[in-house]
Regions:
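Second-shell loop/turn segments in exported
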Residues: 1, 31-36, 77-80, 88, ...
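Structured lumen-facing ectodomains of secretory-pathway proteins
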Residues: 1-51, 58-60, 67, 73-123, ...
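Metal-dependent peptidase/peptidase-like ectodomains
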Residues: 1-14, 164-278
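Soluble non-cytosolic domains of exported or imported proteins
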Residues: 4, 37-38, 122, 131-139, ...
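Solvent-exposed loop/turn segments at secondary-structure junctions
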Residues: 36-40, 53-54, 67-71, 166-170, ...
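Short, solvent-exposed loop/turn and secondary-structure capping segments
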Residues: 57-60, 72-79, 153, 171-175, ...
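Short helix-loop-beta-strand segments that form the rim/entrance of peptidase-like active sites
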Residues: 122-129, 143-172, 194
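His/Asp/Glu-rich mid-to-C-terminal helical/loop segments that flank catalytic regions of hydrolases
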Residues: 280, 284-339
């Protein structure tokens, strides 16, 4: 409130009033707090570790994630009530159809909620934090970037690290970057995206697929669509891990109804004919919910994914030749995506 408005309201200069002063004025009025979206510039964040081979350092391997999420809810909800409901009715969070719970399901929901109430009181929340989607992938590329930067021996090719914005609004950041890349787009030899790599254990209520719900489960989208050699290099890097992941290609199948191939940032590069893959530990009950919080992340599993991606990236960056493309380069990068 301005000094002039305060003087009008109080009937005296507010600086002349002592604490506890009673004023005789009565003021009435109406006010409102309008809520409207504000345009704000979002940014991709790009870093480069330069390659060591003069003949190859102008080629780039891209590693990516996205740092945006889906905002907040206008009305807060109880954290534990939502988790209990989703655990029973919507095990894939926002990708599960919304429907009423049956009588039997309400019994299970109340039992889960009763057990949670013994631990803590109700907690209202409206912020969709996105700890897994995609805080997990963002953390991973930062750790991988630090490992490459600190290594005394740099990879032969250069490595791009791109944290995209606008993924949740339709791959806007990655599409913009691929269309206006900071390096020649044809110099990017491959793209590895990490999106939701911090969950996927049995307690997250898996919904099927090879090895789903185990510590070794990992969804792989797009790895062999453009270059089988690229996919095989990633499989070889995985096989060298102390505990290899079980790669699940279920959601990469042509025509799969969930359309994962078209929904992750790797596709923005694939439409230019760049061998591209998206790694994920899978969806869960907190997907696009206010309950996607850091407390539910499995940090050891996240670190294992990041290590495997690092090793695969290093192998590709050091290979004598870039991954060989098996299909023609698309003539129109703006053509509709086909799962």
């Amino acid at each position: 409130m301005s000094r002039l408005a305060a003087a009008s309201l109080l009937g005296a200069d507010p600086t002349s009033l002592a604490p506890g002063t009673t004023v005789a004025n009565t003021v009435s009025g109406q006010f409102d707090f309008p809520r409207a979206p504000v345009r704000w510039q979002a940014r991709n964040v790009v870093g480069i570790v330069r390659g060591s081979d003069p003949a190859l350092r102008t080629q780039y391997l891209s590693l990516s994630a996205h740092h945006d999420h889906v905002g907040f809810d206008h009305s807060p909800v109880d954290h534990d009530s939502l988790r209990a409901f989703n655990r029973v009715v919507r095990p894939m969070g926002a990708d599960s159809p919304m429907r009423p719970a049956t009588d039997d399901e309400w019994v299970r929901i109340r039992a889960i909620l009763d057990s949670l109430r013994q631990v803590h009181r109700p907690r209202l929340d409206s912020i969709r934090n996105g700890a897994d989607d995609d805080g997990s992938g963002t953390v991973a590329i930062l750790e991988i970037a630090e490992a490459f930067a600190r290594s005394a021996t740099k990879p032969r090719r250069s490595v791009l690290f791109v944290s995209h914005t606008g993924e949740e609004a339709g791959l806007l950041g990655s599409r913009w970057y691929a269309d206006h890349a900071t390096v020649p787009i044809d110099s990017i030899v491959a793209e590895i995206d990490q999106d939701m790599i911090g969950r996927g254990t049995a307690s997250d209520f898996p919904r099927g697929g090879t090895g789903a719900g185990s510590p070794t489960y990992l969804e792989v989208i797009g790895a062999k669509r453009i270059s089988r050699e690229f996919g095989e290099m990633l499989e070889a890097a995985n096989a060298r891990q102390p505990v290899p992941f079980v790669f699940d290609y279920t959601y990469d199948q042509p025509g799969h109804p969930l359309q994962y191939y078209c929904r992750a940032d790797h596709y923005s590069y694939a439409r230019y004919g760049i061998p591209s893959v998206a790694f994920s530990r899978g969806e869960h009950l907190d997907y696009h919910q206010v309950t996607d919080e850091a407390q539910y992340i499995s940090y050891p599993d996240l670190a294992r994914v990041a290590q495997m991606v690092h090793d695969g990236a290093l192998a590709i960056a050091n290979a004598p030749e870039r991954p060989r493309r098996d299909v023609p380069k698309p003539t129109d990068p703006n053509a509709p995506c086909r799962q």
